[in-house]
């Protein structure tokens, strides 16, 4: 999400809640209160996957997507119907998108190529600053840091102006192929969308599992729909500083217990404000740094929400392939769901 060079991001986990590790067992009312800064190292250590797949690992929780997991996910395909979960690249500046894509046609189709016997052609170029709250993208596991370290203990010095020498997006160039599970929190609450600032707690995720009759398992991609884009369509864009619905920090422990491989959603994943004093994105930090769990941000889950609801099927094959850019901290993404 937002750049980790910002001081509040680089030191995000320094002030996690003293009781955060036990939040899964507390009530939503107790969880919703802002937590006091303390004991962040304990939670970072408790949810850590560092060394789990070896000292040289740069794949993190994606290691949980085994060959058997991929084959099982492919067997979910019954119809061959596929649906994109990417939002069309935003071309207009808005209060929630200060950096729209810049695209320019460099050659139009008029005329012919010299010596080409009537053959013409077109070309264009585009630039996109994908991290943030607008464009659909994948955060890789060098994107956030905690106390000068990224996932698996690699130093922040591994990321320079020349790119990331460790944990970059290039490690995922073979693609993501696994089971995806839509966790439609808006439908669960019986609304078109959750209001900004609405937290999602572990008990909400548990309740959705029961309702959907799907149990989250090792190697899954979970896709959390808040209805953000439905609200934007209905009411127009709003500043991110006004809040976003999303996961409370207590959900990090829930995901770790189930060995989730990748977290995705239609917003920034973290509820904003975060309800953790002094820490703006604790879910991001725990997922990326402690668990080595990549994140799919700003997905458009409206279509897949309707298609899943129509079928009453909330699990499907997910395929996604980031751009193979050595040293990159993430990538634009077009994840596909196939029934």
Predicted segments, located by residue:
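Active-/binding-site microenvironments in catalytic and ligand-binding cores
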Residues: 6, 31-339
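N-terminal secretory signal peptides and thylakoid transit peptides that target proteins
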Residues: 2-20
């Amino acid at each position: 999400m937002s750049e980790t060079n910002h001081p509040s991001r680089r030191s995000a986990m320094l002030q996690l809640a003293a009781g955060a590790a036990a939040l899964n067992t507390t009530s939503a009312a107790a969880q919703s209160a802002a937590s006091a800064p303390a004991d962040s190292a304990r939670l970072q250590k408790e949810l850590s996957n560092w060394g789990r797949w070896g000292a040289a690992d740069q794949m993190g929780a994606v290691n949980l997507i085994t060959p058997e997991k991929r084959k099982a996910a492919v067997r979910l395909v019954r119809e061959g119907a596929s649906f994109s979960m990417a939002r069309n690249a935003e071309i207009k500046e808005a209060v929630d998108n200060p950096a729209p894509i810049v695209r320019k046609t460099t050659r139009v189709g008029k005329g012919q190529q010299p010596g080409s016997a009537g053959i013409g052609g077109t070309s264009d170029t585009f630039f996109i600053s994908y991290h943030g709250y607008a464009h659909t993208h994948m955060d890789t596991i060098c994107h956030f840091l905690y106390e000068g370290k990224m996932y698996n203990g690699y130093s922040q010095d591994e990321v320079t102006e020349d790119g990331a020498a460790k944990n970059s997006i290039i490690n995922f160039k073979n693609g993501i192929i696994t089971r995806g599970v839509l966790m439609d929190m808006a439908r669960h609450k019986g609304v078109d969308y959750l209001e900004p600032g609405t937290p999602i707690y572990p008990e909400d995720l548990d309740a959705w599992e029961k309702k959907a009759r799907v149990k989250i398992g090792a190697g899954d991609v979970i896709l959390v729909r808040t209805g953000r884009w439905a609200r934007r369509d209905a009411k127009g864009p709003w500043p991110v500083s006004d809040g976003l619905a999303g996961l409370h920090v207590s959900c990090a422990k829930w995901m770790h217990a189930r060995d989730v491989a990748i977290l995705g959603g239609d917003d920034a994943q973290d509820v904003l404000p975060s309800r953790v004093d002094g820490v703006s994105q604790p879910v991001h930090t725990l997922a990326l740094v402690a668990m080595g769990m990549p994140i799919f941000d700003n997905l458009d889950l409206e279509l897949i929400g309707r298609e899943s609801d129509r079928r009453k099927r909330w699990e499907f094959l997910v395929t996604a392939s980031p751009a193979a850019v050595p040293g990159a901290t993430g990538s634009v993404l077009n994840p596909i769901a196939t029934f």
